[in-house]
Amino acid sequence: MLKTISPLISPTLLKVLAEMGHGDEIIFSDAHFPAHSLGPQVIRADGLSVSDLLRAIIPLFELDSYAPPLVMMAAVEGDTLDPSVEARYRDALSLEAPCPDIVRIDRYAFYERAQKAFAIVITGECAKYGNILLKKGVTP
């Protein structure tokens, strides 16, 4: 048993977070994201929300300070975003320090980043456009 590590973080996720180097990226995706067809390592976190997992990992995870560390998918033309999704994620990520800005990129650019990601964590999140990419930084 390890102390102070959230029980929401599976042993597999903990191992992946430890193996990532600075500049590596991880995606916390909604339940509908095509993770398995994109290529990188996939970790299942069924039944958990993205915001709960972000809240659990942020004490262990240094965000990049040299490049935008947070990326979300922009709405497809003609579609809308629910601003409460980003607000929940920002609240979860600001537990340790102020949350950096979240950059929005189009769907296909996000998929390209996902193909190069270190890992994708599929959650039980059902919010539309509920995917977020985190870029790991250097620990101080």
Curated annotation (Swiss-Prot):
Active-site residues from the entry: H22 (proton donor)
Catalytic reactions on record: alpha-L-fucose = beta-L-fucose
InterPro entries cross-referenced by the UniProt entry: L-fucose_mutarotase, RbsD-like_sf, RbsD/FucU_mutarotase, RbsD_FucU
GO biological process: fucosylation; L-fucose metabolic process
EC number: 5.1.3.29
Quaternary structure and partners: Homodecamer.
UniProt similarity note: Belongs to the RbsD / FucU family. FucU mutarotase subfamily.
Protein name as catalogued: L-fucose mutarotase
Gene: fucU
